UniProtKB/Swiss-Prot annotation:
Enzyme class: transferase
Species assigned in the record: Vesicomyosocius okutanii subsp. Calyptogena okutanii (strain HA)
Domains: entry comment: Lacks the C-terminal regulatory region which is replaced by HisZ.
Pathway: Amino-acid biosynthesis; L-histidine biosynthesis; L-histidine from 5-phospho-alpha-D-ribose 1-diphosphate: step 1/9
Protein name in UniProt: ATP phosphoribosyltransferase
Lineage of the organism: Bacteria, Pseudomonadati, Pseudomonadota, Gammaproteobacteria, Candidatus Pseudothioglobaceae
Location (main, coarse): cytoplasm
Length: 205
């Protein structure tokens, strides 16, 4: 038996066609059901759908064998006890520093609003920039407007939301996309089956 963890929401919509091309189909009635473990067209493969931030947790602890998670989640929560085996090239965006002007970034101690605390801390430490990180779970663009922060660190896709709120992306931190990850122990114990799936998914990219 092979178990795969997928993310809810936008990533799932882009993941399902990819998996179908690789030979794995989840029926609509399964997706719309209240079941926590979903059946697929293959009797030896089950799927679990969870919040994006929980995907690496399930895979790291061996609750599932494989998973598909955003690089932003892997950077933030760590990637211990799992292998990142494929960049799937879906749900693409960039993790960036944005502010109202370049001058706002010229501070002795920069106030940064973000939900990506660990990634932000690493980035500014590497730059040698002192910063105070203010963790927010949403409405990031509001922080500079109301004086809560000098800048934000967030995912940028088209940049339209930033522009609508008077923010400009100035500094690039990381390219983000969905990645296929595998539990280290599962890769040893189910090597042939997992390698076959990695190949199938790679061929469908």
């Amino acid at each position: 038996m092979l178990t795969i963890t997928l993310s809810k929401g936008r990533i799932l919509k882009q993941t399902l066609p990819l998996l179908e091309q690789a030979g794995l189909i989840i029926a609509k009635q399964e997706l719309n059901s209240r079941k926590l473990i979903l059946d697929t067209n293959l009797t030896d493969v089950k799927v679990i759908i969870v919040r994006s931030t929980d995907v690496p947790v399930f895979v790291q602890h061996g609750a599932t064998d494989m998973g598909i998670a955003g690089k932003d989640v892997l950077l933030e929560h760590g990637a211990n006890n799992l292998f990142e085996v494929l960049d799937l090239g879906i749900a693409k965006c960039k993790l960036m520093v944005a502010a109202e002007s370049k001058n706002r970034l010229k501070q002795n101690t920069l106030k940064v609003a973000t939900k990506y605390v660990n990634s932000t801390k690493r980035y500014f430490q590497n730059k040698g920039q002192s910063c105070e990180i203010i963790k927010l779970y949403g409405a990031m663009e509001l922080a500079p407007k109301v004086g809560l922060a000098h800048c934000i660190v967030d995912l940028v896709d088209t940049g339209n939301t930033l522009k609508a709120n008077g923010l400009i992306p100035f500094e690039y931190i990381e390219k983000i996309s969905s990645r296929l990850v595998v539990n280290v122990a599962s890769f040893r114990t189910k090597n042939a089956q997992i390698k076959s799936w990695i190949q199938n998914i790679e061929n469908s990219l």
